[in-house]
Amino acid sequence: MVTNISMADFYEKYQHENLDLIDVREVHEFQAGHAPGAKNLPLSTLEQGYKELNPNRTYHIICQGGVRSASACQFLSAQGLTVTNVEGGMNAWPGDVE
């Protein structure tokens, strides 16, 4: 099952909790600026790359605008992972980027 979280709610949690954030944008997009602490796992490599993820963790998934992350969440959920889609993606990110 996929859940969604608004950027406002996510950012509040992000500031106070140690969340697992996966950015599914392509490498060049990630390198141009990403949320501090995010791990890059591009959607194009997700079918193999997801195997690195711990099935006992909850992951928040982000992209640029929310479309790719929603697709990634559907796939990851089908693999048995617990995931939450961050709505609005980096377009809505209010904080600093690395």
Q: What is the predicted function of each stretch?
A:
Residues 23:
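Phosphate-rich cofactor/ligand-interacting catalytic cores and adjacent structured alpha/beta frameworks
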Residues 1-19, 27-58, 67-98:
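Rhodanese-like catalytic fold shared by cysteine-dependent sulfurtransferases
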